[in-house]
């Protein structure tokens, strides 16, 4: 396929996400993924061999999404390049979540300006932890941690797998990410059934999470923070999430992490950074700016990789 036809869907899809985010009135494939996962979990997460059943479900769902996307992409390309471009553009648009997350984080800070209770309710939309007892500082911290972590999950990682395996790889990654967000918890209900979903998510996010942190410190013009990120990025229950969070903590000179409640259970997480200063709206604006610059850098990098791949294949 001509290089322009490979790169055009990426640029258009990214610009659409930049302008529109995820409109509530549009059906989203991740919602379908979620229903499929909920169906499988309901029927399989019971009785014996839960770990095996959870692993098989995850593998079947991920490979199934990849194969279906690969088949559709190739069939549409055979029919007409224009159809292929439309399909790829729509998938890329749906798989990127940069704008929606930024809107949600801004909404958290605006809600906090009205009341603590509104802030708690708003942040509950984007975090998995229990929010009913969070202080205003903890609400702001949760929002900014999520902004950093989901720059990786919602933008950098999807683009990384797009660059490596094309649109099928990008969609398969979204299935991995959705599986982890729904069943990848260490609670009594999910610790056996969802452990392989969590392990797969750890593997596919290993490089993107560290790349995200690198892009963030470059975007901030603070490459000397690399040692801080490497040292503090390991202070997290996740092998990956700590790196983008450490990058933002270093950029803002603040502290993330600490103990949180999930589904009523206390998880004692280490701290990232040491400066426990109050977070402000200005910090949120700085974090959003860093996200956007890192996003642009990743789009450029993805275009270069896809262009080189196309040139080599030709």
Show the residue positions of the predicted features.
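Hydrophobic alpha-helical transmembrane segments
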Residues: 1-171, 184-314
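Pseudouridine synthase
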Residues: 174
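Substrate/ligand-engaging "lid" and interaction regions
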Residues: 177
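Glycine-rich phosphate/dinucleotide-binding loop and adjoining beta-alpha-beta core of small-molecule
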Residues: 180-181
């Amino acid at each position: 396929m001509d290089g322009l036809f490979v790169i055009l869907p990426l640029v258009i899809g990214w610009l659409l996400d930049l302008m529109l985010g995820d409109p509530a009135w549009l059906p989203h494939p991740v919602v379908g993924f979620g229903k499929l996962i909920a169906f499988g979990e309901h029927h399989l997460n019971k009785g014996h061999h839960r770990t095996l059943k959870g692993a098989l479900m995850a593998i079947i769902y991920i490979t199934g999404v990849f194969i279906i996307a690969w088949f559709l992409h190739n069939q549409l390309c055979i029919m007409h390049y224009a159809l292929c471009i439309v399909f790829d553009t729509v998938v890329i648009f749906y798989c990127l979540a940069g704008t929606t997350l930024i809107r949600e984080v801004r909404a958290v800070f605006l809600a906090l300006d009205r009341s603590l209770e509104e802030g708690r309710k708003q942040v509950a939309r984007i975090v998995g932890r229990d929010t009913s007892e969070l202080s205003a500082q903890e609400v702001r911290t949760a929002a900014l941690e999520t902004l950093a972590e989901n720059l990786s999950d919602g933008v950098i990682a999807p683009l990384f797998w797009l660059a490596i395996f094309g649109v099928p790889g990008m969609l398969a990654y979204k299935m991995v990410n959705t599986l982890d967000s729904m069943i990848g918890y260490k609670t009594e209900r999910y610790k056996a059934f969802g452990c392989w979903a969590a392990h797969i998510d750890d593997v596919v996010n290993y490089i993107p999470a560290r790349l995200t942190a690198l892009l963030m410190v470059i975007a901030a013009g603070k490459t000397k923070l690399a040692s801080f990120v490497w040292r503090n990025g390991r202070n997290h229950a996740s092998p990956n999430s700590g790196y983008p969070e450490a990058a933002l903590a270093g950029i803002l000179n603040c502290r993330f992490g600490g103990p949180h409640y999930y589904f009523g259970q206390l998880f004692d997480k280490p701290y990232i950074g040491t400066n426990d200063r109050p977070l402000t709206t200005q910090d949120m604006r700085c974090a959003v700016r860093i996200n956007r610059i890192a996003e642009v850098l990743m789009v450029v990098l993805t275009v270069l990789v896809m262009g080189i791949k196309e040139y080599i294949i030709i």
